């Protein structure tokens, strides 16, 4: 009987350990400290989440979902944001979660709807925020850009200076606007340029689509590290 009791106790301990292995990551992930719906229309929704310590001295703004087909730059990077603030109590991340519900799989319409949701509901909000920098997340096919990179469509001095530091100290590339071309990107005209003009260093962040979700999450954390070092006060 005593042997059976010991076996039962061991089994119970194993069950508890296995349960903790699955439950602990959920318990140990920082939940939003503040959530607000900024927009809810027939084209989609925009929800503002603030992750981390409200009094943190460093603030990063992250915009995901502007182009709904670029899924590798959405949920994996949201995961990165939550995990990052959990491990960095001096940082908070303002996350603008854009979810296009009308024609999300249509290349032209999905992009149009996402860009206008950001223009209508994110631009003014992030402009009035305490964000030290703004990251606009995208992913790209192999022929569009090279690897992981940041771009600065507004070519404002703050964004350019930070991007040059990122390029010099990491394996991230930097694609500046040369000044010889007319920038025709609608997302730049509607979103990244106006936000940069509001005084916030703004970065179009591009990742390749031939990577894993794990890679996407970890590279986003690397970028957050560099933003804290180079952009945050």
Predicted regions and their residues:
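Structured catalytic-domain cores with a bias toward divalent-metal coordination
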Residues: 2-233
């Amino acid at each position: 009987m005593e042997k059976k009791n010991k076996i039962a106790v061991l089994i119970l301990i194993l069950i508890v350990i296995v349960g903790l292995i699955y439950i602990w990551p959920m318990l140990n992930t920082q939940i939003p400290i503040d959530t607000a719906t900024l927009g809810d229309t027939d084209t989609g929704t925009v929800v503002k989440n603030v992750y981390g310590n409200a009094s943190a001295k460093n603030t990063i703004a992250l915009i995901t979902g502007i182009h709904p087909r670029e899924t590798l730059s959405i949920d994996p990077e949201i995961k990165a944001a939550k995990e990052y603030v959990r491990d960095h109590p001096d940082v908070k991340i303002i996350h603008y979660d854009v979810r296009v519900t009308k024609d999300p799989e249509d290349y032209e319409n999905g992009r149009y709807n996402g860009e206008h949701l950001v223009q209508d509901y994110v631009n003014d909000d992030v402009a009035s925020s305490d964000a030290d920098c703004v990251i606009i997340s995208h992913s790209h096919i192999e022929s569009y850009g090279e690897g992981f990179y940041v771009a600065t469509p507004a070519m404002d001095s703050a964004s350019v200076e930070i991007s040059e530091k990122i390029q010099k100290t990491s394996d991230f590339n930097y694609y500046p606007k040369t000044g010889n071309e007319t920038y025709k990107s609608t997302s730049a005209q509607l979103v990244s340029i106006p936000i940069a003009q509001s005084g916030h260093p703004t970065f179009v962040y591009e990742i390749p689509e031939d990577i894993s979700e794990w890679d996407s999450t970890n590279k986003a954390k690397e970028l957050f590290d560099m933003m804290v070092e180079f952009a945050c006060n």
